[in-house]
């Protein structure tokens, strides 16, 4: 079962959903990646929480430009913390 989404992650999701519902339909598809950058950000925030989700989303947005070919780039799976190492 997935862990619940933190309140900070929910706050970070608000502008992403606003973009997906209101801005993206006006400008059309522009993302070079699958899943799209906004969907990637939603998945990253829900899976990894606020801090790591924002970090992963920011890295992804920096890669989304005309000089990058894009392609399939899924959100990395959640790693269990190994405290013995």
Curated annotation (Swiss-Prot):
Pfam families (alphabetical): YidD
Record's bilayer topology term: Peripheral membrane protein
Coiled-coil ranges per UniProt: none
Keywords for the protein's UniProt record, in alphabetical order: Cell inner membrane, Cell membrane, Membrane
InterPro entries: Membr_insert_effic_factor_YidD
One Gene Ontology cellular component: plasma membrane
Subcellular location: Cell inner membrane
Role, per record: Could be involved in insertion of integral membrane proteins into the membrane.
Family: Belongs to the UPF0161 family.
This protein's name: Putative membrane protein insertion efficiency factor
Organism: Vibrio atlanticus (strain LGP32) (Vibrio splendidus (strain Mel32))
High-level lineage: Bacteria, Pseudomonadati, Pseudomonadota, Gammaproteobacteria, Vibrionales
